[in-house]
UniProtKB/Swiss-Prot annotation:
Disulfide bonds: none annotated. Keywords: NAD, Oxidoreductase. Coiled coil: none annotated. The active site is at R235, E264, H296 (proton donor). InterPro entries: D-isomer_2_OHA_DH_cat_dom (IPR006139), D-isomer_DH_CS (IPR029753), D-isomer_DH_CS1 (IPR029752), D-isomer_DH_NAD-bd (IPR006140), NAD(P)-bd_dom_sf (IPR036291). This is D-lactate dehydrogenase. The keyword NAD applies. The keyword Repeat does not apply. NAD(+) binds at R155, I156, D175, M206, P207, N212, M233, A234, R235, D259. It comes from Streptococcus agalactiae serotype III (strain NEM316).
Amino acid sequence: MKLKVFNVREEEATLAQDWANRNHVELSMSEGPLTLETVNEVEGFDGIANAQIGPLDDAIYPLLKEMGIKQIAQRSAGVDMYNLELAKQHGIIISNVPSYSPESIAEFTVTIALNLIRKVELIRANVREQNFSWTLPIRGRVLGNMTVAIIGTGRIGLATAKIFKGFGCRVIGYDIYHNPMADGILEYVNSVEEAVEKADLVSLHMPPTAENTHLFNLDMFKQFKKGAILMNMARGALVETKDLLEALDQGLLEGAGIDTYEFEGPYIPKNCQGQDISDKDFLRLINHPKVIYTPHAAYYTDEAVKNLVEGALNACVEVVETGTTTTRVN
């Protein structure tokens, strides 16, 4: 069996080769993305493992079909970069890695939340200026006294809820599907609006859909509890960034922890030091004094990277051997 792997980082290459040696599979790895210019590299292979960031060109699907490719295994949980229906029309199975390390994202969410609540960024900035005074702007709150709303109570949302619960928080949640594992961990409310009205901290853990794109806009932020904090470790399109910045400037929100930005594709994960960034909203976001921005790094742990690499490659093998996979999304 021969598999083609795109968008491979050095750390992934080592893990992928270890997997290949154990499973007696031939791998060809490329640092570059799957594009119209590179799609011919797939000729003669049985499957593709990919880490697509921006939208995959629609013209690629029929070309893959012509070459006999029947699947793309995405090395992430999110698959919004693929045209799932078009892929299906061309007989291409798209799979993901739905549960590579919920704890990684959950722990990171709570870490950033604590940094915001205890004003760590401001304290560190003061210390760099040799300002060691105790003043009102650096006074924090006790996390355990806060009500936390989890929007999206799947694997990651529930893992996050458990940690907040461990701090003593009251945890409420909203999801169109109630998770039976959430009993005793959080209380479900009837709407997103009800959740944000009650919460001191709102944490997003939902996949992007046409219905929830820019759900968190200025109208929604006006319904937030005064002084609340927003955490988005899910997908950038859930939040209308211009409105978030306005809500922060107006004092509707006290702060925001943002790990995903809707138009991050040109920048993440790249080293852009010394380069001009043309996206003014992105610049405002990453430099806003009330925002802790991180570059889609919430998942980034040893465990998660290993599980993503091996999960995608296992899905490739499963499709080749059985015609489908348990992690199929289309």
